[in-house]
Amino acid sequence: MILRAVVQRVSRARVTVGGEVVGQIGPGYVVLLGVSREDDEAAADYLAEKVAGLRVFEDEEGKMNRSIQEAGGAVLAVSQFTLYGDVRRGRRPGFDRAARPEQAEPLYRRFVERLRALGLHVETGRFQTHMEVELVNDGPVTILIDSEKTF
């Protein structure tokens, strides 16, 4: 169970497919989510709760002390199997540890639904589709999270 997420605090972001905007947010997070072959629903729930609870928005004193909910932000969640690219051998990444689409999509959807159940507005990309993700990093603040608690 090693779900991976790259969480980027943004002032705005959008994802397009074939020139059509399919997801768009103002201030909040872009979450790039990678699902491994070992992942399960518990991993998706854990990661969603961790993302929702992160305190990386400034309070009145300028300290990172507020969650996305307290800041009134939204999430743009994008599935990204390339987070499991392994380049330890050679120069071309191998994706053996990435979940197959039929396993990854339900866990990606579970992650999104859990964020929504926690009260967040969530926009998404399109699963297993070539997308263009545009974002404006705020800070920049970028956090790596995995369900195995490696970082």
UniProtKB/Swiss-Prot annotation:
<dbReference type="GO" id="GO:0106026">
    <property type="term" value="F:Gly-tRNA(Ala) deacylase activity"/>
</dbReference>
<comment type="function">
    <text>An aminoacyl-tRNA editing enzyme that deacylates mischarged D-aminoacyl-tRNAs. Also deacylates mischarged glycyl-tRNA(Ala), protecting cells against glycine mischarging by AlaRS. Acts via tRNA-based rather than protein-based catalysis; rejects L-amino acids rather than detecting D-amino acids in the active site. By recycling D-aminoacyl-tRNA to D-amino acids and free tRNA molecules, this enzyme counteracts the toxicity associated with the formation of D-aminoacyl-tRNA entities in vivo and helps enforce protein L-homochirality.</text>
</comment>
<dbReference type="GO" id="GO:0051500">
    <property type="term" value="F:D-tyrosyl-tRNA(Tyr) deacylase activity"/>
</dbReference>
<dbReference type="InterPro" id="IPR023509">
    <property type="entry name" value="DTD-like_sf"/>
</dbReference>
<comment type="subunit">
    <text>Homodimer.</text>
</comment>
<comment type="similarity">
    <text>Belongs to the DTD family.</text>
</comment>
<protein>
    <recommendedName>
        <fullName>D-aminoacyl-tRNA deacylase</fullName>
        <ecNumber>3.1.1.96</ecNumber>
    </recommendedName>
</protein>
<keyword id="KW-0820">tRNA-binding</keyword>
<dbReference type="GO" id="GO:0005737">
    <property type="term" value="C:cytoplasm"/>
</dbReference>
<feature type="short sequence motif" description="Gly-cisPro motif, important for rejection of L-amino acids">
    <location>
        <begin position="139"/>
        <end position="140"/>
    </location>
</feature>
<dbReference type="Pfam" id="PF02580">
    <property type="entry name" value="Tyr_Deacylase"/>
</dbReference>
<keyword id="KW-0694">RNA-binding</keyword>
<keyword id="KW-0378">Hydrolase</keyword>
<dbReference type="GO" id="GO:0019478">
    <property type="term" value="P:D-amino acid catabolic process"/>
</dbReference>
<dbReference type="GO" id="GO:0000049">
    <property type="term" value="F:tRNA binding"/>
</dbReference>
<dbReference type="InterPro" id="IPR003732">
    <property type="entry name" value="Daa-tRNA_deacyls_DTD"/>
</dbReference>
<keyword id="KW-0963">Cytoplasm</keyword>
<dbReference type="GO" id="GO:0043908">
    <property type="term" value="F:Ser(Gly)-tRNA(Ala) hydrolase activity"/>
</dbReference>
